[in-house]
Swiss-Prot record:
GO terms for molecular function: rRNA binding; structural constituent of ribosome. InterPro entries: Ribosomal_uL15, Ribosomal_uL15/eL18_sf, Ribosomal_uL15_bac-type. HAMAP family: Ribosomal_uL15 (MF_01341). Keywords: Ribonucleoprotein, Ribosomal protein, RNA-binding, rRNA-binding. Binds to the 23S rRNA. One of its GO terms (biological process) is translation. Part of the 50S ribosomal subunit. This is Large ribosomal subunit protein uL15. Residues 1-48 are annotated as: Disordered. Gene3D superfamilies: 3.100.10.10. Belongs to the universal ribosomal protein uL15 family. It comes from Chlamydia abortus (strain DSM 27085 / S26/3) (Chlamydophila abortus).
Length: 144
């Protein structure tokens, strides 16, 4: 039978702390619940996350999935007409190298596409095959 005075708070904050190394009758004496020898018995020991006691850990047992295209992806950038107006002067030739020099695109870029945002206020020379014009830009400059 449960009596009122025998009820205990089950939460860990009310539990009495384990006194370690206080003699054999305490139940936590001698090795202080650490066992004999091994990493866990040493001071300062913290088990590494994912450590499985020397066995092959899960992250090495599970096969790698899929394939990454990161090494083979072609870097294609885009640039707006508004940005071209700000970067280049009237009659200047727009090439991939010129855009890289002005740091308008990534240095790894192999191609750049010009898209419409605002009007083209200046006339530019378009000769580079790696600078592709969108249909909207073609309509702006009058090239079919």
């Amino acid at each position: 039978m449960i009596k009122l005075e025998s009820l205990q708070d089950p939460s860990p904050r009310k539990r009495r702390t384990k006194l370690l190394g206080r003699g054999p009758s305490s139940g936590h004496g001698k090795t202080s619940c650490r066992g004999h020898k091994g990493d866990g018995s040493r001071s300062g020991y913290k088990r590494r996350f994912g450590y499985e006691g020397g066995g092959v850990p899960l992250y090495r047992r599970v096969p790698t999935r899929g394939f990454s295209h990161a090494r083979f992806d072609k870097c294609v950038e885009e640039i707006t007409t508004q940005r071209l107006n700000a970067l280049f002067s009237e009659g200047e030739e727009i090439t991939l190298e010129a855009l890289k020099q002005k740091k308008a695109i990534d240095k790894r870029a192999i191609r750049v596409k010009v898209i419409v945002k605002g009007d083209l206020e200046k006339t530019f020379i378009w000769k580079d095959a790696n600078v592709v014009l969108s249909q909207g830009v073609r309509n702006l400059i009058g090239v079919a």
